[in-house]
């Protein structure tokens, strides 16, 4: 809980703070629960923000999504906001490789800062989900998710699945979208990646595979590219017997291409220093380790 204080990133998130996390699809067993996040969210006095999905489930309309936020306990502890509940706004991506605009919920403009909390794990479409995916697909409205998934072909949710592009274009479109959110909050945005309950499946899956690796730890950074690269390296360097299963998911979907693409866009870097900030490393060997990624 006091990870944010200890992983002092030299930043105090100002004003109205949006905390972007994954509310967890109905039926999913792996998503990070509201109690786990309690200290950090209350410390920044944040509003838990989410956006509607572009596929069927319990989160594709505001009404259903608000009910799920209630059922999963988010609204019991925190202020919550479905950012695309009213309308979309468009952010320009001037140097976008695939898309030149990003459709996000209009409520994004109500916030001065953002704390991005990502549950690091595999993903059936993106290979893995971390900070970059949370910034892109996570913050996009349902039309925006469609636009990214179709690499800019359509914002019509009903036409998403018949317009899927080649995989690398989708991944590059995610990097483009991520850049627009990071740059919007530049200097007032921080990232936490939690390497816990790591399944090959995302928290958006109603039926997800159980975690395949033991928990590794919690990372904090001001750089979304560095923090995702550090997570992938921690998986790759692990001796855990589930490592290959997770890497197969990441590699088969060209997951790491998002790091290369984001690197090219220049809103961060994949070169990092990983600092273990546990005070007593021995005592912590059975618990989550805490790292800062600089």
Residue positions per predicted region:
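Extended, low-polarity segments enriched in aliphatic/aromatic residues
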Residues: 2-38, 42, 46-294
């Amino acid at each position: 809980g006091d990870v944010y204080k200890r992983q002092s990133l030299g930043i105090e998130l100002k004003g109205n703070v949006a905390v972007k996390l994954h509310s967890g699809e109905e039926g999913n067993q792996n998503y990070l629960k509201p109690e786990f996040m309690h200290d950090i969210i209350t410390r920044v006095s944040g509003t838990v923000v989410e956006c509607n999905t572009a596929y069927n489930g319990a989160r594709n309309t505001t009404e259903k999504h608000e009910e799920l936020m209630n059922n999963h306990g988010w609204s019991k502890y925190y202020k919550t906001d479905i950012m695309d509940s009213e309308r979309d706004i468009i952010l320009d991506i001037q140097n976008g490789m695939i898309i030149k605009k990003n459709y996000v919920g209009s409520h994004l403009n109500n916030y001065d800062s953002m704390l991005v909390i990502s549950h690091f794990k595999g993903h059936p479409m993106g290979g893995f989900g971390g900070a970059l995916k949370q910034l892109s697909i996570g913050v996009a409205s349902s039309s925006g998710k469609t636009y990214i998934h179709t690499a800019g072909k359509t914002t019509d949710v009903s036409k998403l699945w018949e317009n899927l592009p080649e995989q690398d274009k989708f991944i590059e479109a995610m990097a483009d979208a991520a850049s627009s959110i990071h740059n919007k909050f530049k200097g007032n945005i921080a990232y936490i990646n939690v390497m816990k309950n790591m399944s090959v499946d995302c928290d958006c899956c109603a039926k997800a595979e159980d975690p395949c690796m033991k928990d590794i730890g919690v990372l904090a950074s001001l750089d979304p590219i560095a923090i995702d690269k550090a997570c992938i390296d921690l998986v790759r360097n692990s001796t855990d017997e589930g490592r290959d299963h997770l890497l197969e998911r990441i590699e088969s979907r060209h997951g790491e291409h998002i790091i290369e693409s984001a690197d090219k866009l220049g809103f961060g870097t994949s070169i990092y220093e990983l600092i273990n900030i546990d005070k007593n490393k021995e005592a912590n060997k059975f618990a989550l380790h805490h790292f800062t990624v600089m």
